[in-house]
């Protein structure tokens, strides 16, 4: 099934880029690293340890929404990396594309801190992790398009959790479209 976007969301260091690229490869889908769409001034700020404001994030979120909409219009499937820390950010990403889903890579502070301390070459300093956890608005009950993925496992397990979530989302969409809950494959 095509024309859909799966947004890998979560704080910095949760594994969005690594897991997103692996799941995209497994499912022969496009992969878009949201960090590549940040305006240069945003990267400069974060590199200096300065958290981004909502105003800073808006042009970036609009670029990501454009990328998602393009996938939808081209009838393609893609995995897009975006922290999506606040509901208002997720709402921007949902605009115009009916098949946007979020895979929330969720883990505890200590696990993610340890991972960030081991990685090299990323512009996001470890010092900003606390501000990311503070900014995170945990998904609400009305956000039915978000699947929580427990990242306190190895990479293969987290990748498989994401792959299974995508397959379940697709199956649910087929069942809803057919309106046939009695169909065996929809049970």
From Swiss-Prot:
The record, for Pfam families, names: SKI
Tell me yes or no: is Protein biosynthesis among this UniProt entry's keywords.
no
Instruction: State a single Gene Ontology molecular function.
Output: ATP binding
**Chemical reaction(s) catalysed:** D-gluconate + ATP = 6-phospho-D-gluconate + ADP + H(+)
GO terms for biological process, alphabetical: D-gluconate metabolic process; L-idonate catabolic process
What does the UniProt keyword field contain? ATP-binding, Gluconate utilization, Kinase, Nucleotide-binding, Transferase
Per the record, the similarity remark reads: Belongs to the gluconokinase GntK/GntV family.
Put simply, this protein is called Thermosensitive gluconokinase
Q: What is the lineage of its organism?
A: Bacteria, Pseudomonadati, Pseudomonadota, Gammaproteobacteria, Enterobacterales
